[in-house]
């Protein structure tokens, strides 16, 4: 792509409108990315336990997710902002490298033969997914005019939903629709889970490759300005210092929301880590990872995760209606309390089919977590520092996950006596606490939720990018 001759800056020159299919193509890669995340979130604890991890060790092994999110996202965001190649563009090199590494990791993961291999592959997989995902957020701001950005993030949200539903359910589909064995030899991964990861790796790479091939990026509007800005902002350490300094200079509403986010994401991480162990031991009454019952339970957890993800997309349509009738604080409080009750209710379930009812509450909470806090926060931030503070806000997603990774293992072993169902109950209590704390948040009266459904990927993301709320 030839360098432009115009001298207008990005702020003064309007980007051309893109067609529906151009927006579709630039967002299609998220289908593959979410396949990877869905397989990781619903199956890693199962793989760790199969490789011999004790119940109290699993949370610590999951620390890879928040740590890579905290480190990789700002690094890739920083580097991709300062990258330009006439042939490869700005974001596409990172799409390709991340997709290639993540796809290979997905293929290798179900073939690990030792716990240390599984733990190491999670670090590689999570880092690689973040390498691909982070620039996708910024791509919408790069290519779309402001009036089309909601459509752009809406398209990403659609592919995120489809990827989460299908990706989480893949092991169950292979076992129940295609008759693939889900009962492995001791210390090995079941064939149905292997096939799910193989398909996930293929879909990840091909979906991202489609976006790379079918999307053209614009060069910097003024190459001289671009190079000057790179020189002016050089020094990644300075960027990290500014970000961490922002924690100590947050506006009041942001401080209040940070506490809500802490308890919300602590609960979510508890669920992602321990649902498989809680369901298999408490409802299926087995801890034998080579048994048919255990693997049936593990597959069912994937179905449950697909249900809450799918339901959240539907609930997102109703959130603005409830918020306009009441308030955003009440809406978020109600959603989080329902999510907490959903998690706690799993303790009382004997028939595994009824876990789907519990997932209704979780899906409602998930829809709200991915939207309402960002809408409330947007009204409390100065417009010229929106992106900066949204990046700082991301810390209160990864920090609680890190805390959960450090303390949930000892709590499960010493307080709950190796009964992970009580760890889920703790997560439910944490989510209810987050809901009650929402009532303390100051929300500007003149800020309203949009009339159309938008998740965290869309709400205010003109300013949010490249911050990313996902693990």
Question: How should each PLM-predicted stretch be described?
Answer:
Residues 1-21, 113-120, 129-132, 136, ...:
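Intracellular loop-helix junctions on the cytosolic face of multi-pass helical membrane proteins
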Residues 323, 329-373:
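C-terminal transmembrane helical hairpin of 12-TM major facilitator-type secondary transporters
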Residues 73-88, 314-328, 412:
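Helix-to-loop junctions at the C-terminal end of transmembrane segments
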Residues 95-114, 338-350:
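C-terminal ends and interior cores of transmembrane alpha-helices
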Residues 131-144, 368-382:
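Intracellular juxtamembrane helix-capping segments at the cytosolic ends
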Residues 55-56, 146-156, 298, 381-393:
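Loop-to-transmembrane helix entry/capping segments in MFS-fold secondary transporters
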Residues 8-66, 255-260, 264-289:
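Helix-loop boundary and gating motifs at the non-cytosolic
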Residues 105-132, 354-368:
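Hydrophobic core of transmembrane alpha-helices in multi-pass small-molecule transporters
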